[in-house]
């Protein structure tokens, strides 16, 4: 057991170093998946030996560690082929090479520079969904990687590889789930493709040219970016503004005694780890009866990254916080977020301030400040 524990500690320490480095080199991300593969092997062996815990680390069932190991092998081998291609020297982030991104439509392709496409079903602004169209999609065919551009038309999101047009999201299928009239509008930046009575085969595509291309498109430029058929009407809409304001309330305050109050106001830049500014102390006159006195920090990021970071907190900074939760996720029918969450609690705000001043949070983990009622704990 001691040998496995030492190897597991070294493996997780290397993982955390890779997360903190936040490299743009593909070979570093290959090393990341090698570490995850080795971690799965160690946990699998520990379970075979009858161990349920290694220190604070819970040993998963054999089927879980085996599945995780297979996933790590797949990602490692795939990235190794990408490294050998002409795209291996491009900048790649940890998010670009994550398992979640690999399985995001179009599945088993790498993607970069996502652009938001808003679709209004039944042409109703209250019945809209956001989708991601990728500027660049990396497709593996037979023995080589090909880089293609993501496209948008009235029918859906697609890319063209060779002479094959592949839709990875069709709006008609989505309209059957979310709409009633099988009509919809596609909003791309400042351009709106209005819904015709039926989908015409002459609908022309919109190419996602770059991260800021839509926000700066003028009326003249938009007319060349979107080509409309006779059955399709194109109009210019004002630039969409991002909705801002408090996040949705968690549960019903009248029916629960455990309330999490996490602020969701102006977000600072990445140099400050995306801290969301907490206006609690600037609004002392308001009612905070549901946010009784227990300060929290809510961490968000990759599940494995959070587990390694939590392990380091228990090892080196256990006096700077009170409790640390297990990793958890928000569940909702339309929630596409893949990030995990960990909640840390503190004795008082001073301890939380000491924690934030002392502990270096990896750039791949964002955090928010808030308060929690612990009446149920």
From Swiss-Prot:
Family stated for the protein in its record: Belongs to the papillomaviridae E2 protein family.
UniProtKB keywords: Activator, DNA replication, DNA-binding, Early protein, Host nucleus, Phosphoprotein, Repressor, Transcription, Transcription regulation
Region (DNA-binding domain): 293-377
An annotated GO cellular component: host cell nucleus
Function, in words: Plays a role in the initiation of viral DNA replication. A dimer of E2 interacts with a dimer of E1 in order to improve specificity of E1 DNA binding activity. Once the complex recognizes and binds DNA at specific sites, the E2 dimer is removed from DNA. E2 also regulates viral transcription through binding to the E2RE response element (5'-ACCNNNNNNGGT-3') present in multiple copies in the regulatory regions of the viral genome. Activates or represses transcription depending on E2RE's position with regards to proximal promoter elements including the TATA-box.
Keyword tRNA processing: no
Coiled-coil portions: none
Subunit structure: Binds DNA as homodimer. Interacts with protein E1; this interaction greatly increases E1 DNA-binding activity. Interacts with protein L1; this interaction enhances E2-dependent replication and transcription activation. Interacts with protein L2; this interaction inhibits E2 transcriptional activity but not DNA replication function E2. Interacts with protein E7; this interaction inhibits E7 oncogenic activity. Interacts with host TAF1; this interaction modulates E2-dependent transcriptional regulation. Interacts with host BRD4; this interaction mediates E2 transcriptional activation function.
Top-rank lineage group of the source organism: Viruses
Ranges where the record places region Transactivation domain: 1-200
Name of the protein in question: Regulatory protein E2
InterPro entries, A to Z: E2/EBNA1_C_sf, Nucleotide-bd_a/b_plait_sf, Papillomavirus_E2_C, PPV_E2_N, Reg_prot_E2, Regulatory_protein_E2_N, Regulatory_protein_E2_N_1, Regulatory_protein_E2_N_2
Entry's localization field: Host nucleus
GO biological process: DNA replication; DNA-templated transcription; regulation of DNA replication; viral DNA genome replication
GO MF, one example: DNA binding
PTM comment text: Phosphorylated.
The organism of origin for this protein: Human papillomavirus 13
